Amino acid sequence: LAVGAQMVASGRIDFMVMFAYLLMVSRIYAPFDQALALVSELFAAESSAKRMRSIMEEPLAEGGSEFMPVGHDVVFDHVAFGYGAGPDGRAGEQVLRDVSFTAREGQVTALVGPSGSGKSTCARLAARFWDATAGRVTVGGVDVSTVDPEVLLRDYAVVFQDVLLFDDTVMGNIRLGRRDATDEEVLAAARAANCDEFVARMPAGYDTMIGENGSLSGGERQRISIARALLKDAPIVLLDEATASLDVENETQVQQALSRLLAGKTVIVIAHRMRTVENADKVVVLRDGRVAEQGSPAELLEAGGEFARMVALQRESAAWRL
């Protein structure tokens, strides 16, 4: 370009000749740019295809169709677990090591511990999202690894922080908890979960389309998830407490809905707030994939161990002001 400009300035070539040359060069290089972009997209597609193939090749969890537990106590018996597997088929890095505790029917068992301690993994193993690599998880005396996951999950209601909404109405999203539920049953569950308050502001009420993952606030999404669980009315509830990120009004609404959901159930809650922990019947403190201590909140506070230290730190941070 600089040489061409110099030649035009010196009169050696005409400006239109220079312009035609530049136009021709741009036309020649355009297909190369497109080819490079296409190659980049092909590499990205290949990477995605590999991930999809790995998912499709993952063996399906199998088990019997009979599930007749005696009660709904959830027992972890010397459980170990590691994500992934190496070429030799052995599990990857251990996330849980020799974890043993019992979540009693009719009680709230709170799992507490620092990030990465294994709380979420325990909740997922309880519902057989994965199988333990050592030890066993039982429900009412039945080893969950022997039960078909679809059959097992009929006895579970799951309320995790990442609430999935679908391209459907509010009522349709709540009905996912139990597909054969009547409209009256869906509305009753929604009212019990305090959904009426925000649904009333929608143009078509419970018939409003909310779209895939929707535009609802965190508290509103959480209440829809609780309504699903109330509608299902399963004897075991797995709850990943999400109130830490909610405003005061939404937190109050969610807590009221949870109190209705948890009554009389076997509850395993991944706890983040001390108010939840203090109201639990049992606390299991996890650290580095092991049970550091367990007992009632009062017992653990009196013992002055890991749990007492965590409570003191949270109370100290709550009292801190700018």
Feature locations, PLM:
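ABC-type nucleotide-binding domain
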Residues: 69-322
